[in-house]
């Protein structure tokens, strides 16, 4: 069990030391034994593998052999501590074991009674409500005290209209963090939540009117507003892009939005597939009994090839062409210098992605959105498509990079959307809606890897791996209706450990299956890139990702890319619109990348074009910096705390600095802290490189703050949040996603 700290009063953020300064000291009255071991925090260190460890990854001062599955922490930092009240279950419980206990739906029985499970997910989690005692009417919120707008609800309005009453009785006192300055107003020169802001005192004042009365007014700083420089011209004044308008969401909810491509294509696919299926079944039933020779051998190869060719010709004459062809797509590029941040459920929010982009992430993805709620205009689902303007900038490329013909880096961007669907028509309509409502997307990625039972049993996510024909149809249809946005797909090795099918599925996506060869002149399904997570759905995180299997898939895609012309149907020249990314399909590997050593090994030995990172950046978001620098970065505790502070500022910009926005920021911060606390500083390790699945014994950090950041106690996470977001609302609640702080569902 990792240690928890005493519940002492921590210093305010403005009192925290600089990254190079001493760490805050614990109050001696608390009697914390860790204070006796207090060490001055070292500055951030850059350690190359060659400098810090010998060739087998063992440091010179570490004679003890490395134990599998256990983080090799130096003995002087290991402590023996019993679990304390309020602490979460030990990390000795494997992540997937906790989830398996939940999904299995069975519990051990003793004396005829079910034992209460101590592991598994905290289902039906609630976070309470962070809101004012009584809300302020929108007719007042952005107006001077004596000049409110007319309330459309009149006397029936249930919100407060008296500004001073609201500020005095219904709104909590202003926060004093960030020196009492509203982070949003400090950056933009105006606050986007008006009088509801928890820092409203920093951008409001009382002015005397002509009749001698005192009037409360909001202030905007024109100088700050002039300094704001939008990174892209289509960003909103808050720096957000891909914001679905209320009109579009209402049109979707009321089924008023037209789908001129998805509708006809879905109807064509349904009719044609039904005809194909009927014809195939009829031919199977009509197969002659004497088709085999006396020796049991089948007909000779030439005869079979001739029959197959005749059959294809007959089908092409019989079946109607699709109502339209795909639009030519923007060209993509993935390379060794472009590490990608994986789509992450809950954790892949805009503030976290923005932080990762600053630290070197070249590609980001939205959280997985379900297609049906998107089509229905669901507000929360469309909110997942919001991106920061920094995600609209082109990726960094090395000079001389091997790019496909027609690729224009200046028109490229970092952010893509990921969706899940269990029916082709849902995927088609969601794709067309995204292309129409949020056109600033690098790609639209189809999730075929999500292992969550709720998604799998609905036929989406990794369930599509068991239905390759259906998956291929979805990719083809998405590619047809997505306008200029390329389509990509993320898959797993398979659903079962003993039956990986990613190789066959990859080949099908590049060459096309038998059924679709009867409908299409060209083989490729249209996926511009394929990402393979080197685990099965059944495996979850019980073992390391299988990079040997990923390497096999990479080799297959390389061979097929090189022989595209040879395997393409030669009846006619392939239409450029049907060729994904100019004929080249990129391949990304995903799984367990936790250091620049892992990244370089995968690039050089697995043959992937790039690596997608999921859990690694959640634990240490500066992993992108390490990859770029080619060395370990031993971040100090105060440097890590500065990242947390930056996340809080970005959260207030994204969700608002009012009571609701502060509560939302706190919730997602604590979700993230449940990952960051797993980080073991490089300076504490005996062996390198670190492994993401290694579990540390209870340890203390090099100073009090480092120990606090490693705490497994969610109450300590709340304490960290209060350093920047002030005391939590009385109704705020937080329950860790897993009782053992598992993180199996973070990445699909």
Swiss-Prot record:
UniProt keyword annotation of Zinc present: yes
Superkingdom, taxonomy of origin: Eukaryota
Annotated active site: 450
Places the protein is found: Cytoplasm; Nucleus
Cofactor: FMN
PROSITE patterns noted in UniProt: UPF0034 (PS01136), ZF_C3H1 (PS50103)
Record field: compositional bias (Low complexity): 1-22
A biological process term (GO) from this entry: mRNA processing
Biased composition regions of type Basic and acidic residues, renumbered to the chain: 23-51, 99-112, 292-314
Catalysed conversion reaction: 5,6-dihydrouridine(47) in tRNA + NAD(+) = uridine(47) in tRNA + NADH + H(+); 5,6-dihydrouridine(47) in tRNA + NADP(+) = uridine(47) in tRNA + NADPH + H(+); a 5,6-dihydrouridine in mRNA + NAD(+) = a uridine in mRNA + NADH + H(+); a 5,6-dihydrouridine in mRNA + NADP(+) = a uridine in mRNA + NADPH + H(+)
GO MF term set: flavin adenine dinucleotide binding; mRNA dihydrouridine synthase activity; RNA binding; tRNA-dihydrouridine47 synthase activity; zinc ion binding
Key words, A-Z: Cytoplasm, Flavoprotein, FMN, Metal-binding, mRNA processing, NAD, NADP, Nucleus, Oxidoreductase, Repeat, tRNA processing, Zinc, Zinc-finger
Stretches annotated zinc finger (C3H1-type): 131-164, 181-206
Cellular component annotations (GO), alphabetically ordered: cytoplasm; nuclear periphery
Entry keyword annotation includes ATP-binding: no
EC number: 1.3.1.89, 1.3.1.-
Residue span of region Disordered: 1-130, 279-314
Residues that hold FMN according to the record: 343-345, 418, 490, 533, 590-592, 614-615
Function (record text): Catalyzes the synthesis of dihydrouridine, a modified base found in the D-loop of most tRNAs. Specifically modifies U47 in cytoplasmic tRNAs. Catalyzes the synthesis of dihydrouridine in some mRNAs, thereby affecting their translation.
Similarity field: Belongs to the Dus family. Dus3 subfamily.
Record-given protein name: tRNA-dihydrouridine(47) synthase [NAD(P)(+)]
Species this chain originates from: Aspergillus niger (strain ATCC MYA-4892 / CBS 513.88 / FGSC A1513)
Organism phylogeny: Eukaryota, Fungi, Dikarya, Ascomycota, Pezizomycotina
């Amino acid at each position: 069990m990792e240690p928890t700290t005493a519940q002492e009063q921590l210093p305010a953020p403005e009192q925290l030391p600089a990254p190079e300064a001493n760490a805050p000291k614990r109050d001696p009255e608390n009697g914390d034994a860790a204070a006796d071991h207090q060490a001055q925090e070292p500055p951030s260190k850059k350690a190359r593998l060659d400098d810090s460890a010998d060739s087998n990854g063992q440091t010179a001062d570490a004679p003890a052999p490395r134990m599998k599955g256990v983080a090799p922490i130096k003995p002087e930092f290991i402590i023996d501590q019993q679990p304390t009240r309020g602490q979460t279950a030990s990390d000795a419980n494997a992540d997937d074991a906790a989830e398996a206990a939940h999904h299995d739906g069975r519990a051990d029985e003793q004396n005829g009674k079910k034992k209460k499970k101590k592991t598994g997910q905290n289902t039906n989690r609630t976070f309470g409500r962070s809101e004012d005692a009584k809300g302020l009417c929108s007719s007042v919120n952005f107006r001077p005290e004596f000049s409110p707008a007319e309330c459309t609800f009149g006397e029936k309005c249930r919100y407060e209209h008296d500004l001073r009453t609201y500020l005095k009785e219904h709104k909590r006192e202003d926060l004093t963090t960030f020196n009492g300055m509203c982070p949003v107003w400090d950056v933009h020169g105006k606050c986007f939540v008006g009088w509801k802001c928890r820092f409203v005192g920093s951008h409001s004042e009382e002015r005397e009117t002509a009749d001698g009365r005192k009037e409360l007014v909001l202030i905007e700083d024109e100088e700050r507003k002039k300094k704001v420089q939008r990174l892209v011209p289509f960003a909103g004044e808050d720096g957000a892009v891909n914001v679905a308008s209320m009109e579009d969401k209402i049109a979707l909810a009321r089924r008023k939005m037209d789908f001129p491509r998805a509708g006809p294509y879905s109807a064509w696919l349904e009719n044609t597939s039904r005809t194909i299926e009927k014809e195939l079944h009829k031919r199977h039933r009509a197969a002659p009994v004497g088709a085999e020779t006396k020796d049991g051998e089948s007909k000779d190869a030439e005869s079979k090839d001739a029959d197959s060719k005749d059959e294809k010709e007959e089908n092409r004459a019989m079946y109607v062409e699709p109502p339209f062809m795909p639009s030519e797509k923007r060209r993509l590029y993935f390379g060794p210098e472009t590490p990608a941040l994986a789509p992450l459920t809950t954790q892949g929010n805009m503030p976290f992605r923005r932080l990762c982009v600053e630290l070197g992430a070249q590609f980001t993805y939205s959280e997985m959105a379900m297609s049906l709620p998107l089509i229905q205009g669901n507000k929360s689902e469309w909110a997942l498509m919001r991106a920061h303007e920094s995600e609209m900038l082109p990726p960094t490329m090395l000079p001389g990079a091997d790019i496909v013909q027609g690729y224009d880096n200046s028109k490229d961007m970092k952010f893509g959307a990921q969706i899940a669907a269990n029916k082709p028509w849902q995927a088609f309509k969601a794709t067309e809606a995204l292309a129409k409502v949020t056109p600033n997307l690098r790609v639209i990625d189809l999730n075929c890897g999500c292992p969550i039972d709720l998604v799998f049993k609905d036929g989406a996510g990794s369930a599509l791996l068991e239905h390759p024909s259906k998956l291929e149809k979805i990719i083809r249809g998405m590619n047809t209706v997505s306008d200029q946005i390329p389509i990509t797909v993320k898959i797993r090795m398979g659903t079962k450990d003993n039956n990986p099918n990613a190789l066959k599925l990859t080949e099908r996506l590049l060459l096309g299956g038998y059924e679709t060869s009867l409908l299409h002149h060209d083989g490729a399904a249209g996926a511009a890139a394929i990402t393979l997570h080197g685990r099965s759905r059944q495996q979850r995180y019980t073992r390391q990702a299988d990079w040997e299997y990923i390497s096999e898939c990479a080799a297959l895609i390389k061979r097929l890319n090189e022989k595209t012309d040879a395997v393409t149907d030669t009846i006619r020249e392939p239409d450029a619109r049907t060729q994904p990314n100019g004929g080249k399909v990129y391949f990304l590997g995903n799984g367990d990348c936790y250091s620049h050593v892992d990244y370089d090994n995968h690039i050089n030995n697995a043959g992937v074009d790039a690596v997608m990172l999921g859990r690694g950046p959640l634990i240490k978001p500066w992993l992108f910096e390490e990859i770029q620098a080619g060395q370990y970065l031993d971040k100090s505790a105060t440097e890590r705390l500065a990242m947390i502070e930056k996340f809080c500022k970005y959260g207030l910009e994204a969700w608002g600095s009012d009571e609701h926005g502060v509560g939302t920021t706190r919730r997602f911060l604590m979700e993230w802290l449940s990952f960051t606390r797993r980080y073991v500083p490089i300076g504490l390790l005996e062996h390198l490189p670190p492994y993401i699945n290694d579990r540390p014994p209870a340890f203390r950090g090099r100073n009090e703050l480092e120990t606090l950041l490693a705490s497994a106690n969610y109450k300590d996470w709340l304490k960290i949040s209060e350093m920047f977001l002030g005391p939590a609302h009385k109704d705020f609640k937080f329950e860790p996603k897993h009782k053992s702080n598992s993180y199996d569902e973070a990445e699909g």
